[in-house]
Amino acid sequence: GMDLTSALTTLQGDDMVYGKWNKGKSELSFSYDVSGYKTKGEKSKQSADYTLTDGSIYTIERNDVESLRKSISHDAKLTYNWSDSTATVFQASLNGAFNNTPDNYTVKDIVDGTRQYKATSRAKDKSYSPVLDIYFFRQLTPCQSVTANAVATYISTQTSSYYDEGTPYKYDVDGKTASLLSEVI
């Protein structure tokens, strides 16, 4: 089947394709979902009043003059099942998520007391995380059974953020982790 959703006034959507097939004791299913957006020119105005120790008020105004926001996400899952209703169950599932938010930015006009200048913020983010899950069950006798399960996961994240309102501030993250969990009962 399919489920498609798109906005008419903005670049925004969420679309899904899925299916399932059965044959004998086996079943194969999949799903794929993609969603994303792109907005340009969103603006906000901010005014902050600070009361100083001498009782005077100090005002800073931040007004957006230019901006771009965009992001896309993909999620996919593939599952295989085999089942003998009297004794055995096997299931293998592979799913993954990929997210990308490239080069978003905002440019602001700053009025800081008597000074006026521009400030820029930039951000980008990318991550993906595949997961493999395997399950097995076998009834050996009416009182004995074996169950086994294993899950393997990998996560990768890359993030970069930059802001300059007079003094630049930047940080980057590049993180990766993997795990394997299993049990037999």
PLM feature segments, named:
Residues 124-129, 164-185:
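Outer-membrane beta-barrel transmembrane domain signature of Gram-negative proteins
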Residues 1-107, 121-156, 185:
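Membrane-proximal, glycine/serine-rich, low-complexity loop/turn segments characteristic
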Residues 57-61, 114-117, 179:
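A generic short-segment signal for beta-strand/edge and adjacent turn/coil regions
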Residues 107-118, 167-169:
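Solvent-exposed, glycine/polar-rich loop segments of beta-barrel outer-membrane systems
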